[in-house]
Amino acid sequence: MAKALFFNFCISLLIIAILVSHEIIPTEARHLRTHRKSIKNSTLTVHEGAGGLRTGGGSVKTDISKEEHGVDEFRPTTPGNSPGIGH
């Protein structure tokens, strides 16, 4: 009787150990740093004025002719000829 009780106790202890260790997930990851190094600038330069900047002088084409932007170019294919995703 004592052997059966001891055996049942060991089996139940083993089952509990397996259930508890199953909840612990082993992870392999890099360690995150808690302290960051502060980077200090040795010199501080302030730019005054816009001496090197260009202002104006550019042109933008705003009108699109019908030859460049035709209606037939953007129509969807018919359902029978659709290549599908990834083809």
Curated annotation (Swiss-Prot):
Residues 49-59 have a biased composition (Gly residues). InterPro entries: CEP (IPR033250). PANTHER family: PRECURSOR OF CEP5, PRECURSOR OF CEP8. It comes from Arabidopsis thaliana (Mouse-ear cress). Expressed in lateral root primordia and in lateral roots excluding the meristem region. Also present in the aerial tissues, such as leaf petioles and the shoot apex region. Residues 41-87 are annotated as: Disordered. Glycans are attached at residue 41. One of its GO terms (molecular function) is hormone activity. GO terms for cellular component: apoplast; extracellular region. GO terms for biological process: cellular response to nitrogen starvation; nitrate import; regulation of leaf morphogenesis; regulation of root development; root development. Induction: Triggered by nitrogen depletion. Residues 63-75 have a biased composition (Basic and acidic residues). Interacts with CEP receptors (e.g. CEPR1 and CEPR2). The modification Hydroxyproline is found at residues 76, 79, 83. This is Precursor of CEP8.
